[in-house]
Amino acid sequence: MSFEITILGSSGGPLEGSTCSILLKPANISYHDIINDNLPDQVLCIDAGSGMGKLTEIIHQETTTKTSYCNFLQYYPDCETVSYYYHPNVTITTPFSNFQPGRPILHTQNIFNNLQNYLISHSHLDHVCSVVINSAGFNKNMSNKILYGSHYTINAMQQHLFNGKVWPNMPSFKIVNLNYLESNRSERIGIYTVKMFDLSHGEFNKLTEDKEDAQHHSNSNSNSNNIWGKRYDRRRSSITTIPQNTSGLIIKNSEALNHHYLSSAFLITLEVPCTTKEPPPSILVFGDFESDLTSKLSRNLFIWKSIASLILRNQLKAIVLECSNCKEIAANELYGHLTPKLLIYELKQLEHECKQLDTATTSTEQPLLGLNVIVNHVKEPIADPNQESQLHDPRKRILAELNKLNEIEKLGCNISIALSGTSIIV
C-alpha cells in the first residue's frame, strides 16, 4: 500500500502563501470517495502553513489544465519543469483533475469538511497560520477539527494565537479542539497510528549580535556587565526570547530544561486490515529541525534508531524533511535549520543505525537504497542589490548538491524536492 501526498506548501519563506503543509491519505482512496462516503478518518493534514486558499488554487489549476503546477517555477530564470524535481520512482498525480471545473471553492470546502485531524510540528507562524485563518470557515457540524501536537506547541497556540486577542478563542467555541501528544508514544488518529518525536529547532536566546549592534550596546551601557558584545562566535537561535509560562499550563517537554526550541517529527503508520498480508506502510514527516552536529544533542539519532527496523523491512515509504538553505553557511546563521551537507550527515547516521541493526549487512551494501527522501522548507534567496543576477532557483541548487553528496556517500536514496501545488504517490 502507498500514500498520496498533496503538497499544499513547501516553502521556508520569506514569501507567504505557500509555507509548509501537506495532506496525506491512502493512495487507493480518492478524494471523491472521501467526500461522497464521508470518510474524515482517511485524511491527515501535517502542519498548516498553507490551507484552503492553496487547495482552491490547486483544484482550479488541475480542473482547468489537467496538469500539475507549481507557481514558484515561474519565479527564477533557471527553473525546470515539475518532473525535474521529483525522482523518477516517485509518481506525480493530479487527484483533483476530474472534479467539476469552475467550482474550486466548493470542492475545497467539501474536502475540508471531511478533514478532521491535524498534526502540528511546532507553533511558528509559517506552520500554523492557515489553520488559524481557515478556522473562521470550519463547519463543526461536518467534522470537528482536532489539532495534535506537543504540550509546548498546543499551549503556545492556545496562549498566543487562539487567545481572543490575536484571533478568537476557537477552542472555547468548539470550532477546533487542541490535543496533546506525548513524545515517543503511539496514538491512534483516524486510520493511522502516530508516534511523535522531539526535535531541536535552535535555541531560545539570541546569543549573537552584529558587531555594530554589540558596539552600540557597549557604548550605551559602558558601566554595565554586558554579555552581548563578547559572543560573536555563538550560534544564533530559532527565536529570540524565552517564552513565559504565566497561565499555569503544564510544560512537560525538555526544551524548558536545555533552552532548545521544541519541534516535532511524526512517524505515521497506516493501519491496514488484518486480512491484508502486506506489512503496514509508514512515512516519517519532520517539522523544522537542526542537525545533531549543530545542537550537540542526540534527538535525531534517537529517531534513526527507532525507524531503522522499518527501513530494513521496507515499510518506510518516505522521509519528508527540511533543507532550508541552498548553500553551506556558518552554524551561527542556521537558525535551527539544515544545509545539504548536514542533511546528508543525518542520512549517514540513519544508514549506520541500519547497519548496526542488521548484523548480516556488509560495508558494501546500501540499506537506504531506494528510500524516498522528500525535501521541503526551502527558503527563497534574499538578493543583495549588487548581486541580483545571482538570484537562481534554490530548489534546483539543493537538488543538485544533495544528488552529488548522495552519490559520493553511496547512500542510494531517491531524492526529490517537494513543490507547492503538486501531488505524489510514495
Swiss-Prot record:
Pfam family, one: PDEase_II
Bilayer-spanning residue ranges: none
Keywords: cAMP, Hydrolase
Domain of life: Eukaryota
Catalytic activity as recorded in UniProt: a nucleoside 3',5'-cyclic phosphate + H2O = a nucleoside 5'-phosphate + H(+)
Enzyme category, top tier: hydrolase
CDD domains, per the entry: class_II_PDE_MBL-fold
GO aspect biological process, one term: cAMP catabolic process
E.C. number: 3.1.4.17
SUPFAM superfamilies registered for this protein in UniProt: Metallo-hydrolase/oxidoreductase
Chain positions covered by the region annotation Disordered: 210-229
Hydrolase listed as a keyword: yes
UniProt keyword Hydrolase present: yes
Family: Belongs to the cyclic nucleotide phosphodiesterase class-II family.
Name this polypeptide is given: 3',5'-cyclic-nucleotide phosphodiesterase
Native species: Candida albicans (Yeast)
Lineage, highest ranks first: Eukaryota, Fungi, Dikarya, Ascomycota, Saccharomycotina
